[in-house]
Amino acid sequence: MSIYLPPRGVHQVRLPGQRIANEAWRTGRPAGRIGDRSQSGYHAHGCPSCPHLGVGPAVSGSPNVFINNREALRVRDVGTALACCGTNLWRAVEGTSSVLINDRQAHRKGDGTEHCGSARGSLIDGSPDVRFGHA
């Protein structure tokens, strides 16, 4: 039997002929990527009589880190909320403190976003097979 000693903070054991059992996989959340959507509650700006549900994809990400061939999302990356009348951008405001991408926290499914400058939301999509941090 051989034991694989992973980097500190990652709990993995590899046995011959077996897949790696990774604690981060079981406890982490799906990694955010460019194109993954964020959603906020209904909010109105630009046209107060017409509140919109803020939903839209991320449009910026890491220039050199890719997840499933898509740019990885980090805190402060932005997306667009397609139905809003006024400023229609959202921004990633939360991420995992255990994974940094380009010196910024990795943004994951369920992490908080700020829509149109004030409305709170969260990332609702993520990678099917890459997870970061602890839930």
Regions found by a protein language model. Give the residues of each.
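Intrinsically disordered, low-complexity proline/glycine-rich segments
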Residues: 1-135
